């Protein structure tokens, strides 16, 4: 019975750019293509950036300037939990009369889990609750900025050279109207510069004088190459003999979370600005319709569009697994659940020999030969005890039980291997009423919803074989 909750035992095959097998709860269904979609075959689009602690929302440009981190929230450098601001009272001398003191509020950062505080690393307390915390300076900041500036200029030069070669090849085919426009150069660092097209009849040799910024003197950035050091500083003599206090040594994770400083001791751990999270939309690459689109507000957990597959495709689950033995036929109980409100007709089919999708099967399966009818989903009917059940004239050898929009069926499994996991594969053919807006106008007498038949490849894992 526990297998009923183990949805990862039942995998659906997605026929996308690459074949993906995943539980139905991790898949999406495109109503326009009428196909399953996984995270591997959709386009991911960033809608908004927000801080998971203070829920501050910011546009992408601002998030890029802040290096995708929140300016007001911090993570503990020891245990990576969110730091909270604590207030305390300290006595300070009055500027007019040094002999007298007054109480003043001071704020510091503290972790409620590992008890780390900003005072442990010598950070001064602040008179305001937010902002202005002391941050360690990276000793290599100037070198990195110089390298970034150099490679940005190098990318612009390469872009100009490529455009010059393109114009040289096309100089005899450029029309007059086209030659009066400009080319907008966008390099890999998202920096743009505009190059003026040559006048009609002008020689292409005039392009040789083009600079990166027309009308401006572009100063060439020069960098000093890194120098290899022949001699390195030796380790202290007591490096291998002195006792190590593990509480004062940082872990590998703590060092990798601060790659610019690489702290060795716990006294060098400084708080890190909290990483921003994103709300993203998923779009089908084939028809470019949205499969998932969340609300813009960070406090909202609702979705404007959420085409998850469990709301459209019948779900198969394993209810009970008997003792499976080599070359002995066993009866397995499965459940089929109809997620839509209308009747759904389902037919289970065995995989053909030589089926390229049937590569993981290790057992022979016998599925019900008859068509199964699943009742529509009705949330109110589940609590109505006086509702009369529908008579579907089920065969007791095939259907074990029926309740609301769920039906239990028997399949027969015969393992074909002496050891290993028992896996069976079959095809599930079902009808689907496409509720998406039709492209053509609906004529009089024509049905508004189109009924189509879909086929899903399902793989069931029953666990290890008994001896």
Curated annotation (Swiss-Prot):
The keyword Coiled coil applies. Belongs to the dynactin subunit 4 family. Subunit of dynactin, a multiprotein complex part of a tripartite complex with dynein and a adapter, such as BICDL1, BICD2 or HOOK3. The dynactin complex is built around ACTR1A/ACTB filament and consists of an actin-related filament composed of a shoulder domain, a pointed end and a barbed end. Its length is defined by its flexible shoulder domain. The soulder is composed of 2 DCTN1 subunits, 4 DCTN2 and 2 DCTN3. The 4 DCNT2 (via N-terminus) bind the ACTR1A filament and act as molecular rulers to determine the length. The pointed end is important for binding dynein-dynactin cargo adapters. It is found in: Cytoplasm, Cytoskeleton; Cytoplasm, Cytoskeleton, Microtubule organizing center, Centrosome; Cytoplasm, Cytoskeleton, Stress fiber; Cytoplasm, Cell cortex. PANTHER family: DYNACTIN P62 SUBUNIT, DYNACTIN SUBUNIT 4. It comes from Mus musculus. One of its GO terms (cellular component) is cell cortex. There is a cross-link at residue 222 (Glycyl lysine isopeptide (Lys-Gly) (interchain with G-Cter in SUMO2)). The modification Phosphothreonine is found at residue 414. Its main location: cytoplasm. Residues 152-172 form a coiled coil. This is Dynactin subunit 4. The modification Phosphoserine is found at residue 203. Part of the dynactin complex that activates the molecular motor dynein for ultra-processive transport along microtubules. Pfam families: Dynactin_p62. Keywords: Acetylation, Coiled coil, Cytoplasm, Cytoskeleton, Isopeptide bond, Phosphoprotein, Ubl conjugation. The gene is Dctn4. The modification N-acetylalanine is found at residue 2.
């Amino acid at each position: 019975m526990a297998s009923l909750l183990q949805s990862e035992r039942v995998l659906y095959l997605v026929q996308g750019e690459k074949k993906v097998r995943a539980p139905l709860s991790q898949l999406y269904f495109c109503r326009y293509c009428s196909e399953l979609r996984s995270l591997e075959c959709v386009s991911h689009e960033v809608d908004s950036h927000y801080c998971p602690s203070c829920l501050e929302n910011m546009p992408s440009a601002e998030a890029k300037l802040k290096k995708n981190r929140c300016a007001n929230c911090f993570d503990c450098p020891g245990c990576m939990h969110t730091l909270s601001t604590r207030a305390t009272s300290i006595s300070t001398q009055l500027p007019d009369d040094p002999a007298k003191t007054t109480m003043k509020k001071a704020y510091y950062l503290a972790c409620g889990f590992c008890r780390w505080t900003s005072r442990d690393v010598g950070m001064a307390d602040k008179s305001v609750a937010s902002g202005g915390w002391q941050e360690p300076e990276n000793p290599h900041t100037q070198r990195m900025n110089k390298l970034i500036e150099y490679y940005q200029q190098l990318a612009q030069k390469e872009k100009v050279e490529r455009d010059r070669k393109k114009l040289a090849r096309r100089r005899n085919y450029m029309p007059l109207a086209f030659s009066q426009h400009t080319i907008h150069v966008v390099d890999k660092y998202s920096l743009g510069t505009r190059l003026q097209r040559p006048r009609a009849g002008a020689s292409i040799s005039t392009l040789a004088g083009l600079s990166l910024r027309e009308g401006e003197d572009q100063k060439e950035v020069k960098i000093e190459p890194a120098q290899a050091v022949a001699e390195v500083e030796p380790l202290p003599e007591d490096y291998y003999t002195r006792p190590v206090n593990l509480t004062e040594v940082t872990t590998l994770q703590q060092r990798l979370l601060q790659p610019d400083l690489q702290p060795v001791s716990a006294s060098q751990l400084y708080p890190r600005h909290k990483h921003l999270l994103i709300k993203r939309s998923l779009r089908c690459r084939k028809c470019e319709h949205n499969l998932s689109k969340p609300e813009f507000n960070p406090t909202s957990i609702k979705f404007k569009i959420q085409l998850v597959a469990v709301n459209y495709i019948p779900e198969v689950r394993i209810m009970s697994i008997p003792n499976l033995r080599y070359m002995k036929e066993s009866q397995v109980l499965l459940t089929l659940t109809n997620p839509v409100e209308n009747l759904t007709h389902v037919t289970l089919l065995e995989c053909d020999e030589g089926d390229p999708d049937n590569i993981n099967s290790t057992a022979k399966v016998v599925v019900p030969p008859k068509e199964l009818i699943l009742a529509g989903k009705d949330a109110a009917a589940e609590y109505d005890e006086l509702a009369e059940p529908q008579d579907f004239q089920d065969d007791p050898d095939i259907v074990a039980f029926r309740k609301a929009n769920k039906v239990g069926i028997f399949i027969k499994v015969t393992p074909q291997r002496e050891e290993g996991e028992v896996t069976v594969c079959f095809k599930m053919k079902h009808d689907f009423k496409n509720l998406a807006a039709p492209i053509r106008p609906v004529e009089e007498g024509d049905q508004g919803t189109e009924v189509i038949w879909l086929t899903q490849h399902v793989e069931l894992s029953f666990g290890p074989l008994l001896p």
